[in-house]
Regions:
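Short loop/turn elements at secondary-structure junctions
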Residues: 2-13, 141-151, 233-300
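Solvent-exposed, flexible loop/coil segments flanking beta-strands in beta-rich domains
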Residues: 48-70, 158
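Surface-exposed interaction regions enriched in Ser/Thr/Asp/Glu
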Residues: 2, 104-152, 216-238, 242
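Surface-exposed ligand/attachment interfaces on beta-rich extracellular proteins
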Residues: 65-76, 263-267
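Amphipathic alpha-helical segments that form the core helices of the histone-fold
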Residues: 27-49, 268-275
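Extracellular/luminal ectodomains and secreted, surface-exposed scaffolds of diverse proteins
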Residues: 31, 63, 77-132, 197-207
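Autoprocessing Asn-cyclization modules and mimics
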Residues: 76, 83-84, 143-215, 220
Length: 300
């Protein structure tokens, strides 16, 4: 799989401007600094929470036919939001009647269970190699219950070809589904579906009401769209807030490398660098060690 540099961030430029109290839409000179701070903050959150991502990704993942199975069950390494296909080690694409996704109540799915009364069993590859013999294609990501979700932006999008890299929304500064303004901002992950093909796009920048995009993001393929409904991804609210706080901290701390702390043992002040704000540390600590947390993806 080819990976591209991601421009999506766990919070948006508009979020940071609000946190910093920048209300003048004309005051944009420092926006590049704020955007860099957002990308740095997103990267730091990913570093602090290895193995987790709070954006959906379309991907085929591979599993060991022995080590990752327990009888009828294939254990998934990360919660699965939407299933596209399951392929056995012998190359057979399993039919929906061959398996059940666990839990039965719906996503997030943590396992694929073969039917007990069926003739199918998990198999190694045809050469006998069990490593990466099984594959599961779908949409994956980590978040908490009912927190990460797609919502409609109130816009439609027309892109004449897979290489068209910009569009002009009807009202870039209008309200979104949560009555927030602007409805589109740098750092957002967008989604559009045409003729059954879904594409993710990332907002690279917005200039003079024109939205510039990175196409075919997060494992999807760029396609042409005509008046397709445009949705945006709402990052887990707690992670989004941590990103806003950390990005604002990086923004304010630019060029400053130490803080003064009083040491009661020496009665002297000590200049010590403060790595992360305490509220951000507290938030990230709550996500550490949480293996495959329960979540559900919604469209609203």
């Amino acid at each position: 799989m080819t990976y591209a540099l991601s421009l999506a961030t766990y919070a948006t430029l508009a979020d940071v401007r609000m946190e910093l109290g920048v209300n003048d839409p004309i005051a944009t000179d420092d926006d590049p600094v704020a955007i860099k701070a957002l990308r740095d903050a997103t990267a730091r959150i990913d570093l602090e929470l290895p193995g987790k991502t709070f954006f959906p990704r379309v991907q085929t993942r591979y599993f060991h036919s022995f080590a990752d199975t327990d009888g009828l069950n294939l254990r998934l390494h990360e919660p699965l939001a939407e299933l596209t296909s399951v392929t056995n080690g012998d190359g057979t694409a399993l039919a929906g009647s061959d398996y059940t996704l666990i839990p039965r109540s719906g996503a997030p799915y943590t396992a694929v269970r073969l039917q007990a009364n069926g003739a199918t069993a998990w198999q190694a590859a045809t050469d006998g190699d069990p490593v990466d013999a099984l594959s599961v294609a779908g949409v994956w990501h980590s978040t908490r219950p009912f927190s990460g979700m797609w919502y409609t932006t109130g816009e439609t999008i027309t892109l004449a070809s897979p290489t068209t890299a910009s569009f002009t929304p009807s009202n870039v500064d209008g309200e979104d589904a949560f009555r927030r303004t602007p409805r589109l901002s740098e750092g957002m992950l967008l989604k559009a579906t045409t003729n059954g093909t879904t594409e993710y796009m990332e907002i690279a920048r917005i200039e003079s009401g024109v939205v510039y995009l990175q196409r075919g993001a997060r494992g999807t393929t760029a396609v042409a769209h005509t008046s397709a409904t445009l949705s945006a991804w709402a990052v887990d609210a707690v992670i989004a807030k941590a990103c806003v706080r950390l990005a604002s901290y990086y923004y304010k701390r630019a060029g400053h490398f130490a803080s003064v702390t009083f040491n009661p043992n020496t009665n002297m002040g000590e200049r010590l660098p403060k790595d992360l704000p305490e509220d951000v540390v507290s938030t990230l600590d709550k996500f550490k060690g949480a293996n495959s947390p329960t979540f559900r993806i919604l469209d609203v």
